């Protein structure tokens, strides 16, 4: 084959590749450059969610302890004919599992329902209660074996409900004061969220003392792009808590106070259905580093890794997952 023919073939191939790339770019530009309304009202329908959180404690030498795995099965149904009427959430099942041990159920939460809706000021907190989730429901919990859950375990279960609504509502829906997902119009935009540098209430338990506080860092949301989850087109929105800090004062017994001081950083992604605006999937990772002082005892340094996945599932799949334990 002559050099001229080879050069001609090479040039034609290059032109074809450039033309194909140009066509793809022309098709992609309207999608990538258009404006989206991610805060549009959600479709009025029932939803079914499976949530799993794994908590891993590290020894001071870096050894990983067997993980605690918490699972929440939550249904959601319209409470009225309008989204303004809110949604009725029902807990079908909550379980925990240590390492490879048996999955253990929390019977008192089976069938527990609550109304989740915006208040008159547009927020989700109800009467000073964080996201309207009554922490009293999580006092004195016992598992299906009749064992009383220690306060830290009960708090982790309570916190699953808080995390669920923080990600699926606080981050994924319009904020009343601005600085929310409604400000993300184009792919590539990033905002500082209204939750940045705030101090959420720490009145989470009768054992938590005055002086406890959690301070958010620079919480951000970023419109990363578009994705597909199980065949459903979604907007991909990243979140990052920045450098958060906390002080927790707990009295497990009248004569013992435990003071925990530390820092937290969590980050993850929301997958929001483009058609319905419901959250299809959430992934979250968190690292917590703290020092625990138990009265006159030696202080203990603690490192905790936490990962969470929330998935919307079909009703039949939900019923299958909610069986057992």
Positions of PLM-derived features:
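Bacterial N-terminal signal peptides that target proteins for export
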Residues: 1-11
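Bacterial N-terminal signal peptides
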Residues: 10-20
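Signature of exported/secreted
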Residues: 26-325
